[in-house]
């Protein structure tokens, strides 16, 4: 019996009841990867020897009845910008090819403490810059629902691997939609937690005021279980919030009668595909049938989210990526004849086109003559966007809308057109700019490609998002679709 499509919750139950050994789970997962991943191309590196070794150690603990840890024996895949000790971490870039970290990220320490098993590292857009996984230096991941379509990005490998049944859960990072958009495109569940909910220690920085790590799963409850495991304050990350640990599963199963839901008119306006609009309208009717009260509201500064985001994110990236200089670690140009040439050539040869574009954009926005006109102005717009959400949340519990304006686009269609590519972030970037939590769940399909529904919550109110997402999932999900892929 293949367990590749079983949930985290079900696998945990099977292991605790001695119905299956961790080593059998791991073998089944690697068999699935061997069979499917040559087509999907979601993994960049496999940690097979260590995974098999750990699984056998857990077998022995299982035999003794010592099955400690929320994720005991559960396999996982990790986006390749999250540091994994002794396992190559490249950020899908030539710049970090062959880089093997000597320390562990906080989220990995937490997952190891709960006895999860690392299967491997997952493909992504280079340094998390992109929305299709097409900027990866190493390979092009495809969408499990349609191999001619992108899986989204930048956490495309993380979403594709979960949808294809290659891991029951993965971790991604979300700077402007990089968990939620690929989750929408691949028909899975992706949570971008509140900024500060999850430690960023060991996440290779793109934009430090926007980045956040979160889980991708095939159902809502699994997602809550994983977020519970990785969240919490961390002394190694000064931006992690000193909030109490939360039982995220405690709200799951509670009804949503009387829950006040806001539907921004801007989220169904210009640029939103008709099939996506229809699916979201149907989802809203479903929420009403479950007892929620849904009203139309306005988030007037939504349209400024993309320009504000790309100035701020690129500015922070230009500073963060200055550390990749060809000297301390990473790609080192062999042709350089001087120190200046070494810097220039290592960075020119080591970074891909999209990363260089954003470094240029960010450096320009921070330059003395343009700082006020671009970076400072973008931060003011960011405040306006946050104020819009604050005003809505005075009267509503949750905001709902599409995750992305369209379904997954075809491979190659937008990679040479950055403005069209950036437009896919219309509905996700405002959430990062405001530091809010957002979750994407499947709500339909168009020509076989999944459509994502996004719920946005108040700061640190992921519990309510899980509550409403779970209730919606009972009425619509793609659980039967995964095994047919």
Swiss-Prot record:
Residues of the active site = 79, 154, 178
The UniProt GO MF terms for this protein read: ATP binding; glutaminyl-tRNA synthase (glutamine-hydrolyzing) activity
Similarity comment: family membership: Belongs to the amidase family. GatA subfamily.
Catalytic activity, EC: 6.3.5.7
SUPFAM superfamilies this protein is in?
A: Amidase signature (AS) enzymes
Q: What is the lineage of its organism?
A: Bacteria, Bacillati, Bacillota, Bacilli, Bacillales
User: What PANTHER family does its record include?
Assistant: GLUTAMYL-TRNA(GLN) AMIDOTRANSFERASE SUBUNIT A, TRANSAMIDASE
Q: Which Gene3D superfamilies match?
A: Amidase signature (AS) domain
Catalytic reaction(s) noted? L-glutamyl-tRNA(Gln) + L-glutamine + ATP + H2O = L-glutaminyl-tRNA(Gln) + L-glutamate + ADP + phosphate + H(+)
The record, for InterPro entries, names: Amidase, Amidase_CS, Amidase_dom, AS_sf, GatA
Q: Which GO terms describe its cellular component?
A: glutamyl-tRNA(Gln) amidotransferase complex
Q: Does the keyword Protein biosynthesis apply?
A: yes
Task: Report the PROSITE patterns cross-referenced here.
Answer: AMIDASES (PS00571)
Signal among keywords? no
User: What is its EC class?
Assistant: ligase
Mind telling me which residue stretches traverse the membrane in this protein? Answer: none
Supply the name of the protein: Glutamyl-tRNA(Gln) amidotransferase subunit A
């Amino acid at each position: 019996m293949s367990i590749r499509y079983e949930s985290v919750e079900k696998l945990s139950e099977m292991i605790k009841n001695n119905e299956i050994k961790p080593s059998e789970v791991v073998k089944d997962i690697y068999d699935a990867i061997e069979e499917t991943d040559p087509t999907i191309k979601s993994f960049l590196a496999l940690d097979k020897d260590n995974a098999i070794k750990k699984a056998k150690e857990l077998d022995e603990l299982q035999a003794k009845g010592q099955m400690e840890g929320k994720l005991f024996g559960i396999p996982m895949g990790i986006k390749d910008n999250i540091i994994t000790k002794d396992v190559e971490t490249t950020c899908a870039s030539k710049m970090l090819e062959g880089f093997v970290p000597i320390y562990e990220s906080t989220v990995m320490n937490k997952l190891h403490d709960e006895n999860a098993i690392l299967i491997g590292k997952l493909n992504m857009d280079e340094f998390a810059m992109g929305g299709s996984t097409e900027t990866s230096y190493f390979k092009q991941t495809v969408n499990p629902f349609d191999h001619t379509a992108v899986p989204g990005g930048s956490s495309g490998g993380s979403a594709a691997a979960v949808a294809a049944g290659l891991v029951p859960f993965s971790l991604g990072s979300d700077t402007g939609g990089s968990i939620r958009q690929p989750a929408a495109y691949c028909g899975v569940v992706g949570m971008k937690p509140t900024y500060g909910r999850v430690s960023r220690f060991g996440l290779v920085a793109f934009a430090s005021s926007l980045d956040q790590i979160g889980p991708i799963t095939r159902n809502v409850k699994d997602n809550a279980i994983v977020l519970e495991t990785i969240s919490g304050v961390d002394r190694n990350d000064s931006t992690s919030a000193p909030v109490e640990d939360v039982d995220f599963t405690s709200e799951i199963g509670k009804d949503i009668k009387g829950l006040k839901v806001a539907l921004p008119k801007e989220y169904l306006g210009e640029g939103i595909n008709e099939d996506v609009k229809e699916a979201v309208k149907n989802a809203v009717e479903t929420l009403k049938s479950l007892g929620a009260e849904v009203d139309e509201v306005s988030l007037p500064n939504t349209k400024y989210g993309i320009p504000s985001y790309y100035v701020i994110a690129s500015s922070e990236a230009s500073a963060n990526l200055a550390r990749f200089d060809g000297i301390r670690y990473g790609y080192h140009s062999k042709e350089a004849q001087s120190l200046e040439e070494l810097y220039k050539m290592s960075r020119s040869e080591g970074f891909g086109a999209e990363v260089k574009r954003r470094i240029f954009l960010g450096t320009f926005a921070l330059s003395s003559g343009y700082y006020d006109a671009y970076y400072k102005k973008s931060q003011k717009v960011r405040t306006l966007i946050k104020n819009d959400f604050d005003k809505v949340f005075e009267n509503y519990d949750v905001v709902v809308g599409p995750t992305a304006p369209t379904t997954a686009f075809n491979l190659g269609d937008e990679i040479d057109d950055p403005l069209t590519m950036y437009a896919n972030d219309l509905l996700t970037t405002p959430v990062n700019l405001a530091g809010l939590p957002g979750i994407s769940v499947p709500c339909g399909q168009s020509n076989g490609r999944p459509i994502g529904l996004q719920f946005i919550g108040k700061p640190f109110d992921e519990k309510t998002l899980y509550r409403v997402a779970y209730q919606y999932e009972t009425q619509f999900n793609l659980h039967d679709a995964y095994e047919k892929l």
